[in-house]
Amino acid sequence: MNESTPNPLIASRFRGFLPVIVDVETGGINAQTDALLEIAAVMVRMDWQGYLRPVGTLAHHVQPFPGARLDPASMAVNGIDPDHPFRFAVPESEALDAIFREVRREIREVANVSWGQRWG
């Protein structure tokens, strides 16, 4: 079994949940008023030594929603220019849909391999 094949130990370590590492950059700390500017998710699998290894990364620059607040202090920390022409940002819903679609695909793949190992 290679490192990209799911290890059944991951289910016991994470109580059946698939760990996904998520990082976001925002225009502030209030989810109701401040913009989501970047999101990234890293899918991981556990190797046979019990170490988590990245197997896929998905990242998007996100367009601030209409009326979103961009706190100057937050923008100074993250250094993001939301108007940069090479950002190629997508709407928040598109970015989140893409991330969730990949997570669901990964869950199905892990479940199928785990199910198949019972019969293998």
Label each region the model flagged.
Residues 2-120:
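Conserved non-catalytic scaffold segment of RNase H-like nuclease domains
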